[in-house]
Curated annotation (Swiss-Prot):
Chain segments carrying region Disordered: 119-179
Protein name per UniProt: Uncharacterized protein UL62
Entry superkingdom: Viruses
Species per Swiss-Prot/TrEMBL record: Human cytomegalovirus (strain AD169)
């Protein structure tokens, strides 16, 4: 009876862990060159997190990461997915001792590509590899929509910047959709598939948010 109870307690200890959240760009963030475990944020819209609002997903291998927090990784039948790397989670209990580094993701939608400069992008509508924007003028997949389709377009000069999101009307700011790239607030960028020009309004957690009306000039 003692053995069975000890095994049960070990299992409970393995499932529990204490999460310590750090900014994604913290000097204590883990190197993303090897497979690691991810946890998905499942609650707390105001940004406050606790152990109850975090759900462990699986081990995944990152294939690209940007300093602005946009992460591309492989997992779930090796399909490429995208998410915003919000925080680094350092764990210190149970089975997590062997895998001490975690990252919390806010998923856009399964398999939905997001435009990011600097490394290979997700596949476009025709199944072609978008490629990496290592050189200005090279073509890559950008302006991807919620349906996962992407357009092939030239890289910006310089090939860097933030992912731009537009808050859809009537959503109350709780849902965003990927649109384009901005280097800094105040510059103009193309918006979505209709290629309208907008002005980058604000900068929030490494992501430029396009707010207000569309500037069509």
């Amino acid at each position: 009876a003692e053995k069975s109870s000890s095994k049960t307690s070990q299992k409970k200890a393995q499932k529990s862990y204490r999460a310590i959240f750090l900014p994604a760009w913290s000097k204590n963030a883990p190197r993303l060159s090897t497979p690691f475990s991810l946890v998905r944020h499942v609650g707390a819209q105001n940004g406050m997190t606790s152990e109850r609002t975090v759900e462990k997903v699986t081990k995944m291998a990152p294939v690209g990461v940007r300093s602005n927090g946009v992460l591309q990784f492989r997992g779930h039948l090796n399909r490429e997915r995208w998410g915003i790397l919000r925080d680094t989670v350092l764990s210190d209990g149970g089975e997590d001792r062997a895998l001490p580094s975690y990252c919390r993701l806010d998923f856009f939608r399964p398999s939905a590509p997001v435009s990011v400069h600097g490394f290979s992008t997700a596949k476009s509508e025709k199944g072609k590899k978008g490629g990496a924007c290592s050189l200005p003028g090279s073509r890559t997949s950008r302006h991807a929509g919620w349906d996962g389709r992407g357009l092939l377009g030239p890289c910006r000069d310089p090939p860097r910047g933030f992912t731009v999101f537009r808050t859809p009307p009537g959503k109350g700011g709780k849902r965003v959709e990927p649109t384009g790239t901005c280097v800094r607030a105040g510059e103009k960028t193309r918006l979505g598939l209709n290629q309208r020009w907008v002005t980058c309004r604000a900068h929030r957690v490494g992501t430029v948010i396009v707010e207000g009306r569309t500037d069509d000039n």
